């Protein structure tokens, strides 16, 4: 039986289902394909449409999942969706009242339309099944844990009516034993704390990285007024049901002004972040601890967006409450697409247990065969030199040992927000300056944010204090302590509090990556690398060969290693761009504005030009008149140098900056860079 699991909303690639759709509506779009209970393929739509945390319908992800399975739409027996139908339709009804010009249509009709229009799939209405949200989360994390009897905890921003649901399993079925209503949401509590620090939805991990620089005792008394812990794992957020909306007011009354985006961080901001993290941990541990003790269950499967708080997970690991803890690599909403598929499989009589523990998250599309890869690399030859060493792992290990920062792309991409050795940026984990160096070269992000280490399973205990509780460190899910005698050595990956979000790689789960870390250890004496996601600040993790080359060419990484090839820049950008085509993403928009010419203002009206990405929180940039003219002539087919526009150095630099910000696409002639905006 072949079952397709989906999440995301029904927006088409170039437009939202209603104007200015909120980023919280059906985020983290993804598709998952399950065959006879086995996870065949899974990929987030953001990897393909290049919009972080996209809400768009996952048409591209569906296409890639089917391709990975060698299947056609007609082979699919059922489609599972990660929220109930009436809940989804109620959301649409609310949106229609806010946008009366939008025709009233509902989810089943619109999902089937997207399948037909985007994929040519005339799916029958009864192929579509809807699943309760938290049950989908619970199924994905429990049935991939390898556990039999377990406590299953789902914590996130919100399901239909609940923010936390507790289950227990006897090895065959999940039984719901408790739930907590949405007004008590720890996910929303953390989000509003995140917004107070000048960040937005999806930036919660930045607050987690900032927290160790702060002292939670500074504002502990203030935060203690926001919640109370009760008996039997209960708690209240104070004022009841309204803390997330009143947090800013309450904190302002205590002298804590919200930070504006782009402002420097003060110690007060760091102390505030520490308090947000501490409060979240206190409440979560109160809930999880009670249910662990009351059920007597010694195994925990933890899911939902809150389960990506790896600092909290580290605390669970050291609490002594459990013998084993499993966190799904895609615990956020993307992973619920898999859980929804498993629910439907079970409802249709398929046995989905027992399943072995998930140890490898490499479930996305690969980079193609060698011939297609060579053709693509050759098409980019005006910008890069390519060589094929006899032993790519040996060559890469020597480059890393020599201090090079490397983009590393191999095999199928990872499912979830972590780069685990298939779409990674790698560097020596020892020099402390590598943290600031990688930030400057690639990420252009806040200097306080830590990088993660990857270590071989054979050496993990020599460098990190791994708790006795089995934590399964395959997916960077847990923050642990770096051994005190190793912290100075591992300067690039040891956080300010001596911690690290460690990945342990084994020969069985990722042979090539394990061999690379092992060989680096043989050359340097330290089998630990800095491992961070392969992307710049303006994009999701890279997926395709063109994504990989684009990211490499718009950062300052020293070398790119893609499959068995070593790639280096051969010329200085942006001067060589004239031989390439310029195109546009489906969400790219160009605007020319005339200033308001009120009476009495002499002269011609002032003109300004802007480019922006038309999606929630999409960036904007002011562009020159010359750039506006260039982009209005670009068609994704004609080389830049043949457009009849004078290409000054200043104009090419401006174009390169737009490419770096992913406002435009650049492609070799013949590849097609996208249509006009």
Swiss-Prot record:
Gene3D superfamilies to which the protein is assigned, alphabetical: 3.30.420.40, Carbamoyltransferase, C-terminal domain
Matching InterPro entries: ATPase_NBD (IPR043129), Carbam_trans_C (IPR031730), Carbam_trans_C_sf (IPR038152), Carbtransf_dom (IPR003696), NodU/CmcH_Carbamoyltrnsfr (IPR051338)
Record SUPFAM superfamilies: Actin-like ATPase domain (SSF53067)
Enzyme class: transferase
Catalysed reactions, as listed in the record: descarbamoylnovobiocin + carbamoyl phosphate = novobiocin + phosphate
The entry's keywords: Antibiotic biosynthesis, Transferase
Enzyme nomenclature, EC number: 2.1.3.12
Signal sequence range: none
Listed GO MF terms: carboxyl- or carbamoyltransferase activity
Function: Carbamoyltransferase that mediates 3'-carbamoylation of the noviosyl ring to produce novobiocin, the final step in the novobiocin biosynthesis pathway. Novobiocincin is an aminocoumarin family antibiotic that targets bacterial DNA gyrases.
Family designation: Belongs to the NodU/CmcH family.
Name assigned to this protein: Decarbamoylnovobiocin carbamoyltransferase
Species the sequence originates in: Streptomyces niveus (Streptomyces spheroides)
């Amino acid at each position: 039986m072949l079952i397709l699991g989906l999440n995301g909303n029904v927006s088409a690639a170039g437009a939202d289902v209603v104007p200015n759709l909120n980023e919280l509506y059906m985020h983290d779009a993804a598709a998952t394909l399950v065959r006879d209970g086995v996870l065949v393929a899974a990929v987030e739509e953001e990897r393909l449409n290049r919009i972080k945390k996209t809400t768009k319908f996952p048409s591209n992800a569906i296409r890639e999942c089917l391709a990975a399975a060698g299947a056609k739409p007609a082979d699919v027996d059922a489609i599972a969706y990660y929220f109930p139908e009436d809940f989804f339709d109620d959301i649409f009804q609310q949106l229609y009242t806010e946008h009366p010009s939008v025709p009233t249509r509902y989810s089943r009709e619109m999902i089937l339309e997207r399948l037909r229009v985007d994929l040519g799939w005339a799916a029958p209405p009864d192929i579509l099944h809807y699943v309760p949200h938290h049950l989908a989360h619970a199924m994905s994390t429990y049935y991939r844990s390898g556990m039999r009897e377990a406590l299953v905890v789902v914590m996130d921003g919100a399901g239909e009516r609940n923010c936390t649901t507790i289950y227990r399993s006897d090895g065959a079925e999940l039984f719901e034993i408790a739930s907590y209503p949405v007004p008590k949401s720890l996910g929303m509590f953390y989000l509003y704390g995140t917004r107070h620090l000048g960040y937005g939805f999806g930036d919660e991990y930045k607050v987690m990285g900032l927290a160790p620089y702060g002292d939670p005792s500074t504002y502990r008394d203030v935060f203690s007024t926001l919640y109370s812990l009760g008996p039997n794992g209960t708690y209240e957020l104070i004022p009841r049901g309204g803390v997330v909306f009143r947090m800013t007011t309450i904190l302002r009354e205590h002298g804590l002004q919200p930070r504006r985006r782009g402002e420097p961080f003060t110690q007060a901001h760091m102390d505030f972040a520490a308090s947000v993290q501490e409060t979240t941990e206190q409440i979560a541990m109160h809930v999880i601890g009670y249910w662990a003790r009351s059920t007597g269950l010694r195994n925990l499967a933890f899911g939902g967006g809150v389960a990506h708080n790896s600092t909290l997970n580290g605390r669970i690991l050291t609490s002594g409450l459990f013998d084993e803890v499993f966190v799904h690599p895609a615990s956020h909403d993307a992973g619920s697409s898999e859980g929804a598929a498993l629910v439907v499989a079970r409802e249709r009589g398929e046995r989905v247990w027992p399943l072995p523990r998930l140890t490898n998250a490499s479930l996305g599309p690969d980079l193609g065969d060698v011939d297609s890869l060579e053709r693509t690399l050759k098409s980019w030859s005006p910008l890069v030199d390519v060589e094929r060493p006899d032993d790519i792992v040996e060559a890469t290990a020597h480059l890393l040992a020599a201090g090079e920062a490397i983009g590393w792309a191999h095999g199928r991409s990872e499912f979830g927000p972590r780069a685990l050795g298939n779409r990674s940026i790698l560097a020596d984990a020892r020099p402390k300056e590598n943290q600031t160096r990688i930030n400057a070269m690639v990420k252009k992000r806040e200097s306080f944010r830590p990088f993660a280490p990857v270590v071989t399973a054979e050496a993990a205990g020599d460098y990190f204090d791994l708790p006795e509780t089995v934590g399964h460190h395959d997916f960077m899910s847990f923050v642990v302590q770096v051994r005190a005698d190793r912290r100075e050595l591992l300067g690039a990956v040891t956080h300010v509090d001596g911690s690290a979000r460690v990945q342990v790689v084994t020969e069985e789960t990722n042979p090539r990556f394990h061999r690379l870390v092992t060989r680096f250890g043989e050359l340097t004496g330290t089998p630990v690398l800095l491992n961070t996601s392969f992307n710049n600040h303006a994009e999701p993790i890279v997926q395709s060969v063109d994504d990989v080359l684009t990211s490499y060419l718009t950062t300052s990484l020293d070398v790119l290693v893609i499959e068995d090839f070593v790639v280096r820049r051969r010329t200085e950008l942006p001067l060589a761009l004239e031989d390439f085509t310029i195109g546009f993403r489906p969400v790219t928009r160009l605007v020319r504005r005339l200033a308001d010419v009120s009476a009495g203002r002499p002269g011609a009206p002032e003109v300004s030009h802007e480019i922006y990405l038309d999606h929630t929180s999409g960036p904007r940039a002011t562009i020159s008149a010359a750039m506006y003219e260039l982009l209005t002539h670009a068609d994704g087919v004609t080389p830049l140098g043949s457009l009849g526009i004078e290409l000054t150095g200043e104009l090419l630099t401006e174009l390169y900056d737009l490419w770096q910000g992913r406002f435009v696409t650049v492609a070799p002639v013949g590849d097609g860079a996208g249509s006009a905006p």
